[in-house]
Design a protein with these regions (language model features):
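Walker A (P-loop) phosphate-binding motif
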Residues: 1-39, 146-149
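N-terminal phosphate/diphosphate-binding loop that engages ATP/GTP or pyrophosphate donors
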Residues: 21-74
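Local cysteine-cluster metal-coordination motifs and their immediate loop/turn environment
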Residues: 147-163, 176-177
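Non-heme iron-sulfur electron-transfer modules
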Residues: 165-180
């Protein structure tokens, strides 16, 4: 899950993030975080090798040592885009975002600040925030098992059913579109809905085409990535 922490400077945002990360890691969650500053700052330094790479035209520039790897991109990137990249690449259970004003993720307000869209908690105690995050992670994990069709055949949308399952009021088998075939389709890093029929067609078609290829074996996880097609150049018209 993704959650944002926002508030004025010196309101205690970073301290809360520290405490939340420690509490979640202690409970076995994999946690990643993003820190945003409204100031025009850079961690790169003029004259350093990475700076020289950038001035020569390289962007982004990656610095790698025996203890860390840092990517420096000399342009602003939205919170949603950074979050999408981190969730796709590192797959944390929880991604904590400190400081961004925008973003489609749920947010926690700290201090005396005007509530932003998507605010779910205001000045919560650490224990209450941890419980909220734990519950949302559990709901997200159940949602990953549901087809995401929001067909309403169970009497709820998929998120509502997931929350009812986490609360112990419903069970996974209550989903009328649940398939034994686990097909997950992501477009731009976001999952799109696929019911029994679509899942069955995709699974049968892909595995059928791959069955004759060397390296394929029944029961193995198959991942296919479709890159955007480059637009074809229009043929030049010669005039007589």
């Amino acid at each position: 899950m993704i959650i944002g922490i926002y508030g004025y400077q010196d309101s205690g945002k970073t301290m809360l993030v520290e405490e939340l990360v420690r509490a979640l890691v202690k409970k076995g969650f994999k946690v990643s975080s993003i820190k945003h500053t409204p100031h025009d700052k850079t961690i790169d330094c003029e004259g350093k090798d990475t700076w020289r790479h950038w001035k020569a035209g390289s962007d982004p520039v990656v610095f790698s040592s025996e203890t860390e790897t840092t990517m420096i991109k000399h342009s602003r990137t939205s919170a949603d885009d950074i979050a999408c990249m981190l969730m796709s690449e590192f797959k944390p259970d929880v991604l904590i975002i400190e400081g961004f004003k925008e973003g489609s993720f749920p947010k926690v307000a700290i201090g005396h600040v005007t509530p932003r869209k998507g605010t779910v908690l205001t000045n919560p105690k650490l224990g209450d925030l941890v419980k909220y995050v734990e519950n949302e992670v559990a709901v997200e994990r159940v949602n990953d098992k549901l087809p995401g069709l929001d067909c309403g055949k169970c009497g709820l949308d998929c998120d509502g059913l997931a929350r009812a399952i986490v609360a112990g009021k419903r069970v996974l088998k209550d989903c009328k579109e649940l398939s034994d075939i686990n097909v997950k389709i992501l477009v731009g890093g976001r999952r799109i809905s696929a019911g029994k029929f679509v899942s069955s067609i995709v699974d049968d078609t892909v595995r059928g085409m791959l069955s004759s290829l060397k390296g394929y074996g029944p029961g193995k996880v198959v991942e296919i990535r479709l890159e955007p097609k480059k637009p074809k150049a229009k043929p030049s018209i010669r005039r007589k």
